[in-house]
A protein has these predicted regions:
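Glycine-centered flexibility motif
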Residues: 163, 214, 238, 243, ...
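A conserved acidic, glycine/proline-rich C-terminal tail/linker
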Residues: 248-275
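HotDog/MaoC-like acyl-thioester-processing domains
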Residues: 1-30, 35-37, 101-201, 267-270, ...
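Hot-dog-fold acyl-thioester-processing enzymes
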Residues: 2-102, 187-252
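Short flexible/disordered coil segments
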Residues: 130-131, 229, 260
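Short, structured beta-strand/loop micro-motifs enriched in basic residues and often containing a Trp
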Residues: 98-104, 256-261
Length: 302
């Protein structure tokens, strides 16, 4: 990754002010002409934030986590969401086009995040990867550091961009990058070594996560908002799903979940009662019909 000077940005603080600016950017991106500069080289974006005890407790309450083992919760999400909005504008992608495909999360500091600490988040746009003839994946890396410059967490996200022109996709510089095939069938359902955990996804979980993370995408706030984007009902955010799973695995094994690789295959509806299946290093989330919603790998440690 070439060394580039960071671009500073501020994340809006107030609830109403943030929501107003967020939805303004959403509808602005929908109405604007797409320039589709997906292979742009953008400088990293930087912001700082402060983790209060109240904010920490709000994240714990969201996931129902009450143990002392530090977990890889995405406290830095508000910075990442706002940076994503800026980058989407720079590369000319409408907000309504994207869908979260996968995340890779690594908590580098074994003590995790600390209350009453200042942190910096650097968001890097990593470019584009092939998906299919008319779709690609765009990639982002968020690096969170403390005031001493130590890396606390790395989070890499892949977003799906569909409905592109075949000729446009063909001319992108993606040499040597082959499309990745994803398994869409549950493998742990009949595995005798897998534990089974019943989850309850509340009707307003996406809304609660949105208020904490800044991801106020209408698809996750209400069924009406979801239908505006062509979905039958609302579903929780990808990183909301990740945080819920991290909490459940940490509680189940009574240890810290330090590393997670997760693929989002089908929406996790709200409300719903999916089942989390897990072995010592793999997990799957399935619905009542046995459809695979989410799958991934993880590492836990004490």
């Amino acid at each position: 990754m070439a060394k580039q000077k960071s671009t500073w940005f501020d994340t809006p603080k107030s609830g109403f002010g943030y929501a107003s600016k967020f939805y303004y950017k959403v509808f602005q991106s929908i109405s604007q002409d797409e320039s589709l500069s997906l292979d742009s080289e953008l400088p990293p974006m930087k912001t700082t934030w402060f983790l209060t005890e109240k904010k920490m407790q709000a994240w714990l309450d969201l996931t129902g986590y009450d143990l002392s083992y530090p977990q890889a919760f995405t406290f830095s999400a508000p910075a990442g969401v706002w940076a994503l909005m800026q980058v989407l504008k720079e590369i000319g992608i409408s907000f309504g086009r994207i869908m979260h495909l996968s995340s890779r999360l690594l908590m580098i500091n074994k003590d995790g995040f600390q209350v009453d600490e200042h942190y910096s988040t650097y968001v890097h746009y990593l470019g584009v990867k092939p998906h299919s003839k008319r779709a690609v994946m765009i990639r982002f890396l968020s690096v969170v550091k403390n005031v001493r410059g130590q890396d606390i967490m790395h989070l890499e996200d892949e977003l799906y961009v569909a409905g592109l022109d075949e000729e446009f996709v063909a001319q992108l510089d993606m040499k040597g990058l082959a499309p990745e095939r994803r398994n869409t069938k549950a493998l742990l359902t009949n595995n005798p070594m897998a534990d089974s955990i019943q989850l309850t996804i509340g009707r307003s979980l996406g809304q609660k996560y949105g208020k904490l993370s800044g991801d106020l995408n209408p698809m996750h706030i209400s069924s009406i908002g979801a239908r505006l984007f062509g979905h039958k009902s609302s579903f929780i955010q990808g990183l909301c799903t990740l945080n819920v799973i991290v909490a459940e695995l940490g509680r189940h094994w009574k240890s810290s979940i330090r590393s997670v690789e997760i693929e989002f295959l089908r929406p996790v509806s709200q409300p719903s009662k999916p089942t989390l299946l897990c072995t010592l290093d793999h997990f799957e989330l399935v619905d009542r019909e046995g459809n695979l919603l989410v799958s991934g790998r993880y590492i836990c440690s004490n």
